[in-house]
Amino acid sequence: MEKPRGVRCTNGFPERELPRPGASRPAEKSRPPEAKGAQPADAWKAGRPRSEEDNELNLPNLAAAYSSILRSLGEDPQRQGLLKTPWRAATAMQFFTKGYQETISDVLNDAIFDEDHDEMVIVKDIDMFSMCEHHLVPFVGRVHIGYLPNKQVLGLSKLARIVEIYSRRLQVQERLTKQIAVAITEALQPAGVGVVIEATHMCMVMRGVQKMNSKTVTSTMLGVFREDPKTREEFLTLIRS
């Protein structure tokens, strides 16, 4: 029996033909150009890359992509146990990356307070869940944040919210650490900021070297945390206590 044109089969299951390299594609909606001369201190107020409307619009395409993955693995997306899997996986992936729908200004605008406090503020052991952008598998761990105020303080729960916004994206741990520190610095203009992340990467546990007990530790030190060894040591001692 002749196969329908425009359709190919993988492991006996029909699959939509992928566009050939170089083939014309629908024009993508261009993003507005970034404003020139923007001040670095305003970078934390940048717009969100994804909206709820984008989620609804892209969910069918994302589910179709998961169906294609199942076929390529030799599975039948139509069997009972997998009937709803593409939609579940698509919805889950949108949740895992929901940080793209949020901005720092959403969280911080009403939670920055004038306060004459000049001693270190630390929130440690903040649970963190993120997705490795290289293998699309999770890495999980804890985040420790400290900053030295400069006439302003931040609501403590907002530090955890900053972690949530940046970790719920496709990430590498090194960049995540720096993004958290830079966001706090640009929003508060403190004397200094320190961020340390300890995480276990599933791409090292479930594949590759398969080391169950390995942890990756990254740090970013800004301001006096970078320039003054005593301040840095105080922070590192307190998060270990």
UniProtKB/Swiss-Prot annotation:
Catalytic activity, as annotated: GTP + H2O = 7,8-dihydroneopterin 3'-triphosphate + formate + H(+)
Single GO term (MF): mitogen-activated protein kinase binding
Stretch list, region Disordered: 1-58
Disulfide bond entries: none
The protein's Enzyme Commission number: 3.5.4.16
Activation and inhibition: GTP shows a positive allosteric effect, and tetrahydrobiopterin inhibits the enzyme activity. Zinc is required for catalytic activity. Inhibited by Mg(2+).
Subcellular locations according to the entry: Cytoplasm; Nucleus
Modification Phosphoserine occurs at: 51, 72
Pathway(s) this gene product operates in, as recorded in its UniProt entry: Cofactor biosynthesis; 7,8-dihydroneopterin triphosphate biosynthesis; 7,8-dihydroneopterin triphosphate from GTP: step 1/1
Assembly description: Toroid-shaped homodecamer, composed of two pentamers of five dimers. Interacts with AHSA1 and GCHFR/GFRP.
Protein name: GTP cyclohydrolase 1
Species name: Rattus norvegicus
Gene: Gch1
